[in-house]
């Protein structure tokens, strides 16, 4: 589901209205010291009253039996009694006065009133204006991130508290009925005994409740991460043993609205494990967290008891557990399973690697028959039972409703607690519900999708601008467009839009362009075939979603490659029977089968019951294929993930023989189109029999009539396994045959906006509506959602009857999220078979042709009038490497490269190549028409680059990567003899796993004095961190030279040096100790063919992107630790290669970094050395921060209480770094939050110079990255100079740091939208004025970097 929220204004007014309303309730005025004193009689009476209300609210809740219900009720009373008797914990620092919440003049947007025509008009265009409103990519962040992060946090809690795993889990599904009113019970059940601290033996918990209870109270959001008892004063830490900021996985944090049911299971071990919750987490409760939407209050109170998170948070969970026997074996196995799943989630969410697409997709389809934890080949019934219980726990966590208020993470606890109190009173029937309905409504629908977005977890998008008229000549493109389509930057000027469209899709695209003349929106995510060089020599089609809009005389196009299965069917022209079927994707077949006797089962028009044997066998096959270990790296990278459909790796199943059904055999089995698609066959029969006809049909022969009607209808369903799947069909009449090209998307999801009262569809994404349900937008807008989800009203009615607290029309439920698995669970309850939830494959949706398809949907309450549905259709597939990009090396001609020198000044280095390229050769350079002629040069160029690299390189990538990373870690840690170094690296590893720990006060603190001292250094002097003068009269450069000479004499060249530049050795003599390398090599690149990656041991994977990956490594011999960036040679854009007089033919990134080394700057990452082999360039850079670092994207996400002064210090360093670049005649061209890293002291480094260029090389046609940071003149297709565009980007960066969201969300807003500021934000006027001046669309009026550096807001 996308991160969809309401506007800043409406959200803030909602907070203040809640606060104002809740203050009128009783029991909210107790003092802060109430935690340290026993409850007053009035407070005790209030607790008793709340318990009475709770009893009433749960009077109709079904429990397993009466005894259990009595135990549950008694446990609540006992825990409240224990709360009264409990000795309070040591007091925290609450001396500082609390700042009052600032009232807002804006009004609440949740007031119930009919949707006006203006509302409907505005909402109608939203789902089609942005590429964030649809997704065909299982890796897309707007698909699963919210659900997976809930699951991730649950896993972390179970792993850190392994005693939970010893509790037996009942086989029966806890009925959702027990969740009724749980929002009101949340504070009482979880906080009554300070969570787990004072639990007594009468308390009843199960794994799910303990896990999610911890998760709820460990999430800092409005619903569950503030003061919990309604009678406590705001800010009182009722959970001193848990840190509410510990699980800030996203600044749009989620909070579970309801805890799972509490079942009668004892926990004998947890009582020994209290220190887990009293440890380092306990002292980190902040008495005041500034509002996320008011992030820059004058906050003077700091934590005094905070301490540095250490390994105990991750290791102490074993302290009090049995260390031998069956119990320990069980724990070890279960924890290993959970850690395996957690690692998978972390890697997929953080690094967005396409190799994990199948795994992520499987989690999105998660049910009991999926996601095998462990080796599926082992037949262990006990293990299977435990795994099944574990999966049930995870499923239950995915089904939990939660609230998501984007402004509430890190919010003022006053607003948090008062809102919670109001909702408790409303749930239980107490309190005063005064005039909330007489407030004038105000909507800002335009900001539904404008929440904080970034490219960090986004799939690569190719962006073009071209002319609006035929032939649609390209004007500009981004670098990813060159990478995706395999073209050079110079070739763009000679290409047209149709050159990139596959011949099978050109008619469709051309018709769409012509039929939408005069309209702004042209494409809204339609699926088309595109051209890549590899597709010219193969029949394999590459598919992409296509979004396009006319703006300012240009057509702006966005392509994103997507997984798509397709099949070609040739029909004879006599009886339209199937003559030949080419099914390389095995869309119509069932692929490898477990039994040679298996046959394809064709479903009926309606979906067959779920959980069929055939479906389960497919799931089993997929899982076994996923867990089949490749025999070598080549097999893993080559066979399983090959884009070419001619080669498929078959899973080696030890238990059963495997038979692959090839398309040629399958084609002989299918003669009737009805076997492929009943709805398609019916249309063809109706046309042939005259039931369906057009006025012009009488003049046309039958094949053309059939072809025209198929193309007009286009969207059908295929008979696929146990249920139907949607598809699109295009037809072409050939000489003797009718060709059908059928394509079907294994994953698609999109936004639907629905009136919550009438359930009419207000708007939806047009492409998703067609591809998933077969309807055109005009056919369904304004009609009921039951047209496509027939059971939707039944679900809502059931929820309103059984769980009235979840009524989507209630004011208080704004921000309520009902997940996909929640509706699966509701469906199971309606069916009277709660266990079926665990094997559910989705909800029935209705296609236009009358066939049922399986879908899932997530519901979000925008306000009491509008709900947002994120509807998903997905099926079980193992995604191949659909995102493979063609090699750029085929286009490289060294004779045409610019000649530069890293040793000279920027002026001479920026000389452009004098050779001009004729227009006639540009087509050849595009590689679209001469693939065969250029292909043979690939290997030759690959080995020629860098002067005899093949002869000198002593290892290949496959040899290096055969050593597993875990073994690398073990051997690397053996080299770390220094305990302090081990400790630092372990902290860095912990922080990389859980970035919320990095930004805690105990670790992260912006050091003002350090930053000011660094900024004040002259850029021309050597970095103090790298080489400090020893006081002997030598300059830093002279001293470094002397040190290097001495090191060479002693055989320690390349060894690490300390802060004084002294070679660090251990007691054994010349053997160096492990340390962080800071000083560059004397002659960078001198060992580029000698040094190899196998000389290093990888300690940690740090990231992966479109062009390469990054690892933390230690040198085996010299024991120095560096960060190595590995750049794929085949993905280096042909236009970014340069010939350096000293360094040879290298990527411009290395050349520019080497040039910057001559005049280093504190805020720019230095180049230590580089080397290469056949596949990669390896760039060595210093480690930033001894305990790791975090990029600005994550800092904004997790550092929710950042002050304006801290933001100023960080931004000032960015400005200083960019100023140094501009002074050297260099433009960065890819400034964004991900390319700014920050250490634990707030010290900043600018990284990633892969797109950097010299100013004199401009003007530039190709821009870098995605739309978010692109300047309007760049999107307008105009050549740009570089520096003003860097300025625009840092303006976007500043706005993002201050307001936690991008200022512009789509192309319209970038080109002509007003710059909006939230009046409720307590941001200084000077800061706002600076942002306004930077984000000026008039390029001449945009300030220079010197103007910004001297701005009064940046004066410190």
Curated annotation (Swiss-Prot):
Entry keyword Magnesium: no
Biased amino acid composition, Polar residues: 26-37, 54-64, 952-961, 1021-1032
Residue(s) carrying Phosphothreonine: 1079
InterPro entries: Kinase-like_dom_sf (IPR011009), PAS (IPR000014), PAS-like_dom_sf (IPR035965), Prot_kinase_dom (IPR000719), Ser/Thr_kinase_AS (IPR008271)
Binding site for ATP: 1102-1110, 1125
Domain of life, source organism: Eukaryota
Any one GO molecular-function label of the UniProt entry: protein serine kinase activity
Primary localization class, coarse: cytoplasm
Broad enzyme group: transferase
Residues the record lists as Phosphoserine modifications: 10, 192, 202, 255, 286, 327, 926, 1018, 1023, 1035, 1055
Bias kind Low complexity: ranges: 99-115, 592-608
EC number: 2.7.11.1
Pfam families assigned: Pkinase
GO terms under cellular component: cytoplasm; cytosol; nucleus
All residue ranges annotated as the Protein kinase domain in the record: 1096-1354
Active site: 1230
Other facts: Present with 967 molecules/cell in log phase SD medium.
Assigned protein family: Belongs to the protein kinase superfamily. Ser/Thr protein kinase family.
Function text: Serine/threonine-protein kinase involved in the control of sugar metabolism and translation. Phosphorylates UGP1, which is required for normal glycogen and beta-(1,6)-glucan synthesis. This phosphorylation shifts glucose partitioning toward cell wall glucan synthesis at the expense of glycogen synthesis.
The protein's name in its UniProt record: Serine/threonine-protein kinase PSK1
């Amino acid at each position: 589901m996308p991160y969809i929220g309401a506007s800043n204004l409406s959200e803030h007014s909602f907070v203040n209205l809640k606060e104002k309303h809740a203050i009128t309730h009783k029991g909210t005025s107790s003092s802060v010291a109430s935690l340290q004193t026993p409850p007053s009689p009035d407070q005790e009476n209030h607790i008793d009253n709340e318990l009475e209300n709770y009893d009433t609210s749960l009077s109709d809740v079904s429990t397993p039996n009466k005894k259990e219900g009595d135990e549950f009720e008694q446990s609540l009373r006992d825990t409240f009694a224990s709360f009264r008797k409990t000795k309070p914990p040591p007091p925290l620092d609450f001396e500082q006065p609390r700042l009052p919440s600032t009232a807002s003049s804006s009004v609440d947007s949740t007031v119930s009133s009919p949707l006006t025509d203006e509302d409907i008009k505005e909402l109608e265009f939203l789902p089609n204006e942005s590429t964030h409103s649809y997704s065909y990519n299982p890796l897309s962040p707007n698909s699963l991130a919210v659900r997976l992060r809930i699951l991730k946090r649950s896993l972390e809690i179970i792993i850190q508290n392994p005693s939970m795993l010893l509790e037996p889990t009942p086989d029966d599904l806890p009925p959702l009925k027990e969740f009724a009113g749980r929002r009101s019970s949340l504070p009482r059940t979880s906080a009554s005994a300070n969570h787990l601290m004072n639990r007594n033996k009468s308390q009843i918990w199960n794994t799910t409740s303990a896990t999610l209870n911890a998760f709820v109270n460990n999430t800092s959001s409005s619903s569950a991460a503030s003061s919990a008892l309604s009678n406590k004063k705001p800010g009182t830490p009722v959970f001193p043993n848990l840190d509410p900021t510990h699980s800030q996985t996203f600044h749009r944090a989620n909070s579970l609205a309801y805890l799972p049911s509490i079942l009668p299971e004892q926990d004998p071990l947890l009582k020994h494990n209290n220190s887990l919750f009293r440890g380092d987490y306990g002292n980190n409760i902040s008495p005041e967290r500034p509002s996320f939407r008011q992030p820059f209050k004058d906050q003077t109170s700091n934590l005094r008891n905070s301490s540095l998170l250490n390994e105990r948070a991750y290791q102490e969970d074993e302290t009090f557990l049995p260390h031998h026997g069956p119990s320990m074996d069980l724990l070890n196995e279960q924890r290993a399973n959970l850690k395996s799943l957690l690692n998978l989630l972390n890697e997929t969410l953080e690094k967005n690697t396409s190799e994990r697409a199948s795994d992520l997709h499987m989690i999105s389809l998660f049910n009991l028959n999926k996601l095998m934890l462990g080796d599926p080949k082992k037949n262990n019934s006990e293990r299977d039972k435990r795994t099944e219980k574990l999966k049930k726990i995870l499923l239950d966590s995915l089904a939990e409703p939660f609230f998501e208020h984007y402004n509430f993470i890190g919010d003022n606890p006053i607003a948090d607690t008062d809102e919670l109190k109001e909702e408790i009173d409303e749930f239980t029937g107490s309190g005063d519900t005064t005039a909330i309905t007489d407030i004038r409504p105000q909507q800002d629908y335009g900001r539904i999708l404008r929440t904080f977005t970034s490219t960090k977890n986004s799939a690569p998008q190719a962006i073009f601008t071209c002319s609006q008229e035929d032939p649609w000549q390209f004007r500009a493109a981004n670098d990813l467009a060159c990478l995706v389509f395999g073209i050079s930057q110079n070739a763009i000027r000679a290409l047209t839009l149709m050159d990139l469209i596959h011949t099978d899709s050109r008619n469709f695209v051309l018709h769409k362009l012509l039929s939408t003349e005069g309209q702004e929106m042209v494409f809204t995510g339609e699926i088309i075939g595109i051209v890549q060089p590899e597709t010219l020599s193969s029949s394999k089609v590459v598919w992409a979603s296509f979004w396009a809009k006319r703006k300012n005389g240009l057509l702006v196009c966005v392509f994103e490659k997507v997984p798509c299965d397709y099949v070609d069917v040739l029909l004879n022209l006599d009886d339209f029977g199937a003559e030949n079927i080419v099914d390389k994707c095995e869309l119509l077949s069932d692929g490898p089968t477990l039994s040679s006797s298996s046959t394809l089962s064709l479903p009926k028009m309606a979906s067959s019951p779920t959980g069929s044997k055939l479906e389960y066998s497919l799931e089993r096959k997929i899982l076994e294929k996923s867990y089949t270990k490749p025999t070598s790296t080549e097999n893993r990278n080559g066979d399983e993930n090959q884009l070419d459909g001619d080669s498929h790796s078959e899973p080696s199943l030890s238990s059963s023989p495997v038979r692959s059904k090839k398309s040629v055999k399958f084609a002989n089995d299918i003669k009737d189109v009805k076997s492929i698609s009943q709805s398609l066959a019916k249309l063809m029969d109706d046309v042939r029999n005259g039931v369906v006809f057009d006025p012009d049909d009488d003049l046309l022969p039958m094949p053309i009539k059939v072809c025209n009607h198929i193309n007009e209808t286009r969207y059908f369903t295929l008979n696929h396994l146990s249920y139907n799947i949607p598809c699109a069909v295009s037809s072409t009449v050939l000489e003797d045959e009718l060709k059908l090209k059928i394509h079907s998307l294994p994953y698609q999801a999109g936004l639907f906006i629905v009136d919550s009262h009438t359930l009419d569809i207000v708007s939806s994404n047009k492409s998703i509506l067609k591809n998933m349900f077969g309807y055109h937008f005009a056919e369904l807008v304004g009609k009921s959602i039951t047209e496509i989800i027939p059971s939707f009203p039944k679900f809502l009615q059931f929820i309103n009857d059984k769980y009235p607290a979840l009524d989507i029309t209630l004011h208080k439920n704004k921000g309520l999220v009902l997940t996909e698995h929640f509706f699966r669970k509701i469906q199971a309850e309606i069916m009277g078979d709660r266990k079926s939830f665990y094997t559910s494959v989705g909800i029935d949706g209705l296609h236009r042709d009358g066939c049922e398809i399986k879908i899932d949907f997530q519901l979000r309450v925008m306000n009491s009038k509008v709900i947002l549905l994120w509807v998903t259709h997905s099926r079980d597939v193992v995604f191949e490497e659909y995102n493979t990009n063609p090699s750029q090396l085929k286009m490289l001609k060294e004779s045409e490269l610019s000649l530069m020198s890293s040793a000279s000044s920027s002026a001479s280095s920026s000389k452009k190549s004098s050779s001009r390229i004729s227009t006639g050769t540009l087509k050849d350079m595009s590689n679209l028409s001469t693939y065969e002629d250029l292909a043979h040069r690939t290997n030759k160029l690959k080995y020629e680059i860098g002067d005899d690299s093949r002869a000198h390189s002593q290892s290949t990538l496959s040899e290096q990567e055969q050593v597993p990373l875990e073994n690398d870690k073990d051997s690397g840690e053996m080299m770390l003899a220094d305990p302090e170094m081990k400790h630092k690296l372990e902290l860095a590893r912990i922080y990389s796993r859980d970035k919320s720990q990095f930004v805690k006060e105990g670790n992260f603190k912006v050091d003002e004095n350090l930053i000011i001292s660094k900024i004040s250094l002259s850029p021309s002097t050597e970095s103090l961190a790298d080489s400090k003068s020893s006081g002997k009269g030598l300059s830093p450069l002279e001293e470094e030279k002397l040190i290097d000479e001495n090191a060479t004499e002693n055989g320690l060249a390349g060894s690490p040096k300390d802060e004084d530049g002294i070679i660090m050795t251990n007691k054994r003599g010349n053997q160096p100790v492990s340390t962080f390398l800071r000083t560059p090599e004397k002659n960078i690149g001198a060992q580029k063919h000698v040094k190899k990656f196998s000389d290093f041991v990888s300690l940690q994977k740090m990231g992966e992107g479109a062009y390469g990956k990054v690892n933390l490594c230690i040198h085996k011999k010299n024991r120095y630790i560096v960060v190595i960036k590995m750049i794929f040679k085949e993905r280096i854009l042909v236009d970014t290669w340069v010939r350096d007089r000293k360094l040879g033919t290298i990527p411009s990134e290395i050349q520019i970094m080497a040039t910057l080394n001559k005049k280093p700057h504190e805020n720019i990452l230095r180049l230590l050395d580089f080397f290469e082999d056949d596949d990669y360039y390896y760039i060595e850079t210093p480690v930033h921060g001894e305990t790791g670092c975090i990029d600005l994207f994550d800092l904004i996400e997790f550092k929710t209480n950042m002050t304006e002064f801290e933001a100023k210090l960080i931004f000032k360093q960015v400005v200083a770094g960019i100023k140094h670049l501009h002074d050297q005649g260099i433009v960065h061209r890819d400034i964004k939050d991900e390319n700014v890293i920050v250490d634990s002291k707030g010290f900043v480094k600018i990284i990633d110079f892969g797109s950097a260029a010299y100013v004199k090389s401009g003007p530039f046609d190709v821009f870098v990255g995605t739309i978010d940071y692109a300047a309007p003149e760049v999107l307008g297709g105009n050549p740009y100079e570089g520096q003003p565009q860097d300025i625009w980007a840092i303006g976007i960066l500043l706005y993002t740091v201050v307001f936690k969201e991008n200022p512009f969300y789509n192309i319209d807003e970038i080109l002509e939208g007003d710059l909006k500021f939230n009046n409720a934000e307590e941001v200084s006027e000077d800061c706002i004025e600076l942002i306004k001046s930077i984000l000026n669309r008039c390029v001449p009026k945009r300030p220079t970097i010197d103007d910004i550096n001297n701005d009064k807001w940046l004066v410190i």
